[in-house]
Amino acid sequence: MLRIAVAAALAAAAVSAHAQMTEEVARQAAQELRMLVTEGTGVIGDLQPAINGSKTTKEQVSPDALVNAFRARYQKAAGNAFDPKATGIVGDARRAYVQSFTSVVTRYQGNLNKGGQDAFVPAFFRAQVLKDFNQLMSGKVQAYATNRDAELINGDWAVHKVMKGSPLAGEVKTLMETGSLEPVVKRSGNTVMGYYPMKLAPACVSCHAQNGLKQTEGGFGGAFVAEIPVK
């Protein structure tokens, strides 16, 4: 039912897909995007031991169960229940994110059910969700997850690829080179940028080590970037 409601709401919002917003609203939207992506990706992160050990159950990884897990994580982090009926850009982003999340976990049911080491890792999941999300929110909001070239497990997630054509690509690359863990939310020309560094969790360090990448827990692990056109 939620998926049907989300699809209907997105269709109704399509007429405003290219409307620009104020800087203040864009900053709020950037924060919301950070919350959505962090908590959504965390759902798959929580399941990594079960996925890697081929110990998931069909009920545990069904699309509905995973969406419910996302809603629970969101509520715990935000302090408020997830409301997909919210108005404005925040509501549009929530609906697009849930639709993208649901679409991806539905497409990859085989991986989630069969499992195995690295069968469905959080970074891959996040990349697929953002790809779908960006298509739904074209002209309104774009979201990216990327890292420094020397620390990429997958070259497809390099800045020059995921942010191709973005006015923020050069600035993001420069910020990442500093390795700073401080977020940056600012206006750059006609765009508000939400730049949010990601810290490496123990599971990430362990997984990356298997690919020959030596990293430190709590260190810089790439960045999530929100790009929002403004008036």
Predicted regions and their residues:
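Extracytoplasmic c-type cytochrome modules immediately beyond a signal peptide or single-pass transmembrane anchor
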Residues: 19-199, 213-231
